[in-house]
Amino acid sequence: MTESCTVFSFSGPKGIPDYFPPDSAQFVAVRDGLLTAARRAGYGDIELPVFEDTALFARGVGESTDVVAKEMYTFADRGDRSVTLRPEGTAGVVRAVIEHGLDRGALPVKLCYAGPFFRYERPQAGRCRQLQQVGVEAIGVDDPALDAEVITIADAGFRSLGLDGFQLEITSLGDGTCRPQYRKLLQEFLLQLDLDEDTRRRAELNPLRVLDDKRPQVQAMTAAAPVLLDHLSDGAKQHFDTVLAHLDALRVPYVINPRMVRGLDYYTKTTFEFVHPGLGAQSGIGGGGRYDGLMRQLGGQDLSGIGFGLGVDRTLLALHAEGKTVGETTRCDVFGVSLGEAAKLKVAMLAGQLRAAGVRVDLIYGDRGIRGAMRAAGRSGARIALIVDDCAIKADGVGVRDLATGEQISVAVDSVVAEVISRIAPS
């Protein structure tokens, strides 16, 4: 009797990429470069759950937004509680600030974070269902200088990676004084248009969301809609003008985009987006803005805040569009080749010493001859190969070969670490 064997074949979830060498090195370099810019400005790291109470996002992000209405991964846990994989970072940070009383200490609370976020979107280049972001949040101070600092951090993060073809677009979405009047004006304009039923419902519920509609036919109909920048209160206008003055002084270039509407309901006053022409129609690589009512809306003090989220995946695509790469392209600096059992132990000991000194070392495994071992060394991308055989151990010698030139010398075992470090140290 022959037993049948089931063969399994698994693929990753649709719209979610795997990152592995060498591409993963570039991904890590982009993420860390963007985070470093925030840390240098005094922002501390915060780690948050990847899922939260669904009501947090419904209330914080806005029930009429596409994010909440169409894009969230929501499910019931085993306690029959509705939870959602986080679609963005700000609501979770604000929840943590309120829950742990961080807003009761020194202000502003300055936090940064990185990690995966989840949106059920149509998969396409740079639009993944698991998107990787770096974000910052500054909570507790309503100061246009802080807005400028947050924007400057993002600008500096991109430039630190060598990215220079991006553009900062900025506007103001007003405050509680002018928004209600503008909302009424916009609603009157929209309801006279020949809108489909769903769009008309959004116009009645939250007219700003209609301006965020990406369908060409809707954009054409709303092209003549009133612009919020023309209806700012004196306070909102002064705030926006001061932000621009700071950006001018800091030499951060920008373009005012009066028709920008971000996809999240909590934005007020300063709102911005970084775009890159190399990404086509889906050109955004990051954005953010001020959210002065969100703390109160989520049950906290009436404190202001500002932040951003920058797409790691999309920044990497923008770099590639400019023909640039970042990060280490090789996995190791040194490749250890052992010929014989005693040699294998000696190479492992040397590798441990070099790794402790901060040198990246990979080793040959399995029984290979010298030719196969050296081919593996060449493919590793290492600059140096350590070659040890059982005979060399008796003579207290280790072969140190420059893999670029092929030059090889014999070095005493006790001198190998110093010799290697001297060779790979920056000149």
UniProtKB/Swiss-Prot annotation:
- For this UniProt record, give its keywords in alphabetical order, as a comma-separated list: Aminoacyl-tRNA synthetase, ATP-binding, Cytoplasm, Ligase, Nucleotide-binding, Protein biosynthesis
Any GO MF annotation of the entry: ATP binding
PROSITE patterns recorded: AA_TRNA_LIGASE_II (PS50862)
InterPro entries xref list: aa-tRNA-synth_II, aa-tRNA-synth_II/BPL/LPL, Anticodon-bd, Anticodon-bd_dom_sf, His-tRNA-ligase, HisRS-like_core, HisRS/HisZ, HisRS_anticodon
**UniProt GO BP:** histidyl-tRNA aminoacylation
Q: Write out the annotated subcellular location.
A: Cytoplasm
Q: Which domain of life is it from?
A: Bacteria
Q: What is its EC number?
A: 6.1.1.21
Q: Which GO terms describe its cellular component?
A: cytoplasm
* EC class name: ligase
Q: Please give the chief subcellular localization of this protein.
A: cytoplasm
Q: Which Gene3D superfamilies match?
A: Anticodon-binding domain, Bira Bifunctional Protein, Domain 2
Pfam families referenced in this protein's UniProt entry, alphabetically: HGTP_anticodon, tRNA-synt_His
Catalytic reaction list: tRNA(His) + L-histidine + ATP = L-histidyl-tRNA(His) + AMP + diphosphate + H(+)
Q: What does the record note on quaternary structure?
A: Homodimer.
User: What family, per the record?
Assistant: Belongs to the class-II aminoacyl-tRNA synthetase family.
Sorted alphabetically, which PANTHER family does this protein's record hold? HISTIDINE--TRNA LIGASE, MITOCHONDRIAL-RELATED (PTHR43707:SF1), HISTIDYL-TRNA SYNTHETASE (PTHR43707)
Q: How is this protein named in the record?
A: Histidine--tRNA ligase
Gene name? hisS
